Amino acid sequence: MKYADILLPVPLEGFFTYAVPERLREQIAFGMRVLVNFGPKKTYIGIVVRTHDEEPKGYKTKDIIDIADSKKQDR
């Protein structure tokens, strides 16, 4: 399983880890904007800050919904 840490525009510190669905695994990369669910009803566009294979402990991850752009954002 592949995971991505996502920076979201919310007033909370840190990144949020999401599972990368099989259909997006070859495309997802640092700096891309992605569409994710946050909480029970919110959907946000966030930025991928890291991809990895480390399963988070203590909670079940949500899947990334889709990629918002076709290219990475510059730093």
Give residue spans per PLM region:
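Accessory, non-ATPase domains that flank or precede helicase/AAA+ motor cores in DNA-metabolism machines
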Residues: M1-R75
